[in-house]
Amino acid sequence: MTTIRTLVVAAEAFPLAKTGGLGDAVSGMVQALGHRPGGVDVQCELLMPAYRGTLDMVYRPRTVARLGGLPGGPASLVRGHCPGSGLSVLLLRNDALYDRPGIYVDDSGQGYPDNARRYAALAHAAARLAQGLPGLRPPHVVHAHDWHAALAPLLIHAAGLHYVKTLLTIHNLAFQGTFPAELASALGIPLACRHDDGALSDDSVNFLKAGIRYATRVTTVSRAYAREILTPAFGCGLHGLLRARGADLSPVPNGIDTALWNPAADPHLGGLRFDALDMRNKACCKAALQAELGLQPRADATVLAMGSRLTGQKMADVAIAALPALLEAHEHLQFALIGRGEPALETALRALAARYPGRCAVHIGYDEPLAHRLHAGADLLLHGSRFEPFGLTPLYAMRYGTLPVASRVGGMVDTIRDPGPAVEESCAGQGTGFLFDGSEPADMQLAVARALRALAKPAVCDAMRRNAMQADFSWRASAQAYAGLYASLASAPQRGRVPAPTLPLLANAA
């Protein structure tokens, strides 16, 4: 069996670094690829920055290379193994760039002003590894995730490394990594690529555009999103380029770690475990969640949860506007939130909690164990979104029998089965949640009210919970798709569609 060496390049991977779904998706994918999906032997190694505390988390760290001439200064590559999975990881260490309180933003929520250099350095490190470093075999495939790694395909292409194929996965097209064009030289972008058909867009360097332009193949994380991003409404200005790459663009849906998100064996539930065949402890999880968050201890309450970045994309503004009327109209309704994001939205949510003490609980920040307890104890998950590449959070909720009330966009169209009008006649069918159109408070209010009516019918509620908990959202099928894609890339001859300038990378000085 031929082994396909794959370098996975990303800004996040759980548990080393995580701010949202990207960290979960990267780690889940890499772990699943280690099980020889479809009989393909994939040897994955992860490349990511050595953020503050990351080096302390890996096992047996040792420096394996030193890299000079990177944007932001010299760095070292430290190899270690991730806790739990044993996954091999290369950490790019440059304390001046990465030893900071946050991954992307400072304590005030502002993005670091040198983020362009921080993630250009990551891409250059990937390109050096693709060239081959002493004692480190070059990969057959470099798999870059989102804008943070998206310069890697350009650099590999420009260096003439035609034997190394590149794959870019778009997790969120809205975040493109745009920076002033005058930084192009400092970022090590070759002169031949500094144009509107290359790395530039509207007089800015656009990391994600560069990746889409120069990657051998491009994937997105859901079928619906792959269709949506070809349109002006969802293409974020890149729909034309994506349509031009249409033959090389394909969806590979995400999965979730079903061992980590498993109510029957979750260590974060304090022994209150349950499954689709015996859900009695879910009520106990609700009582425990109410006590933990300061909600009224009512067994008859319906807990509506929200676990999300607090941004306009996630319709946090709409939820804030919709919730008062919902709480006033449904006296048994309670609301619990975990999230952080835009300061104005955080302030508005704190004010909502103060207005409805005992019925509204707001936890600003992210707490992984609490997130598990939130999904276990809630009845419904509110997950509005103006666009949604995939939507991992509804899948976590469904694993715990918490039914999502979500926008009918992106990946949620593929993963959530709405029972339709039949639910009003006490027929759950194959339903696993509730989808709604629109982005007005009234749209969200009507959807939540519809879900509350369904939950008031025990037979419907129980059937939908079982459907949700028994749905297969594992990485198995996705890992097979990626492994097959790697195999086709590794065996493919060099294509001549895009002329490749053979320019040197930044000096590989020690």
Curated annotation (Swiss-Prot):
Tagged with keyword Glycosyltransferase: yes
EC number: 2.4.1.21
Record keyword Ribosomal protein present: no
Family matches, as Pfam families: Glyco_transf_5 (PF08323), Glycos_transf_1 (PF00534)
Pathway(s) annotated for this protein in UniProt: Glycan biosynthesis; glycogen biosynthesis
Catalytic activity as recorded in UniProt: [(1->4)-alpha-D-glucosyl](n) + ADP-alpha-D-glucose = [(1->4)-alpha-D-glucosyl](n+1) + ADP + H(+)
Signal peptide: none
Xref: InterPro entries: Glyco_trans_1, GS/SS, Starch_synth_cat_dom
HAMAP family: Glycogen_synth
Name listed for the protein in its UniProt record: Glycogen synthase
